[in-house]
Amino acid sequence: MLTPVVSYSTVREVKGPLIVIEKTRGVSYGEIGEVIGPDGEPRKVQVIEVGTDYAIAQVLGGTLGLPAKGSTVRFYGKTLKMPVSEELIGRILDGKGQPRDHMPLPPPEDFRDVNGEPLNPYSREYPEEPIETGISAIDGLYTLVRGQKLPIFSGTGLPHNMMAAQVVRQSTVRGSEEEFAVVFVGVGIKTEEALFFMDEFRRTGALRRAVAVLNLASDPVAERILAPRVGLTIAEYLAWQLGYHVLVVITDMTNYCEGLRELSSGRGELPGRRGYPGYMYTDLATIYERAGKAHGKKGSITQFPILTMPHDDITHPIPDLTGYITEGQLVLSRAMWGKGIYPPFDVIMSLSRLAKDAIGEGKTREDHKDVANTLISAYSKALEIRNLATLVGERNLGWRERRYLRFADAFEQKFIKQGYYERRSFEETLDIGWDVLSILPEDELTNARPQITQKFYRRHIFESVKL
């Protein structure tokens, strides 16, 4: 049990999730303590601002019923640390790292600062090994790479929660399943969403290799800021100390940024773009940059954050700043979802900057780059022909153009679309890719190497298509 270093009874103000303490001396940024109200109930606090004779602390347990008068604050001279253990795998925690599954925490093997220790850029290793998610649109076109940070840009009402659950359930590093773990972090999610994730993880057995950190929308806003850091602290211990390949799925980073804006407003800071704090880019980087691989370390941390774009606006500060820090983005399309396609990826708007180095012979399959490049270029051309067909009519198109229309339909319905419980291997994904590409004439596949086309092209499919 921690011994208080200093106590203050000079709480000047309780403002939202924050308290202002006057006449402080020697209190440090990030220091933890507790505030005790007249009712005698202790609530954990963390210092987020230090002045010449004052300090501002966020109350992690919320300030409901906490008056300024009669409250005492104790500081311990330490930063917030998370007790970590391999036995956390299979557990469900709240945003503070406390049990949400009504079981005691396992004996700690170590205590880790929740703010983490940034990787020295010189010690970082370039990510080059793929993670198989079992989702064709990701594995085939925008492969997730071990050590990468690849966000999903979604919108309100789109099935990003289903995708998050499917990725947690299906993802694996081939050949090292026993060393693979998932850390799922729900940030500011509704009770209904939390029940969905808990039921899904337990029912499908995904929880056996996962740690779930669930912060609810009804929890204090300070916990919303803490939840991703708690999850990443557990991931860092599993990766750097125990050698696990850890996939961290965080949803929804928009809720995190809204919490950041609320805390910033409570502190009276000057707002930046659309009311968000000017340091939001730096703050997001402290989360996203905790992904990666390190020389001499067996494990890795891969981040798969999910955010909902307000009003589907990809230029909004949250997706805009996220795109600067991360290595690509997977964009969900409302139009595809309206056509009944799950997962509803916008193929043209999506990008994975590291995929090219993690696919091919010895990693996935020799034809992977050829399939990915050809599918994207052919689909882009097919969309242009679709627009043309709405103007002149399909009957007035040439036979090649009509082939592209058949290809686009098959690509969306057979390659992109798949079942929620359907898991496809890399080989199955690439085979489906060749099935839909073979609708086109062989001489149209100019983005694939001739020897690859000759080996994998299905001429019988080309001949069976009716125009």
From Swiss-Prot:
GO terms for molecular function: ATP binding; proton-transporting ATP synthase activity, rotational mechanism; proton-transporting ATPase activity, rotational mechanism. It is found in: Cell membrane. GO terms for biological process: proton motive force-driven plasma membrane ATP synthesis. Residues 95-114 are annotated as: Disordered. Its main location: membrane. One of its GO terms (cellular component) is plasma membrane. The keyword Cell membrane applies. Keywords: ATP synthesis, Cell membrane, Hydrogen ion transport, Ion transport, Membrane, Transport. It comes from the Archaea. The keyword Plastid does not apply. Component of the A-type ATP synthase that produces ATP from ADP in the presence of a proton gradient across the membrane. The B chain is a regulatory subunit. NCBIfam families: PRK04196.1. HAMAP family: ATP_synth_B_arch (MF_00310). This is A-type ATP synthase subunit B. It comes from Pyrobaculum islandicum (strain DSM 4184 / JCM 9189 / GEO3). The lineage of its organism: Archaea, Thermoproteota, Thermoprotei, Thermoproteales, Thermoproteaceae.
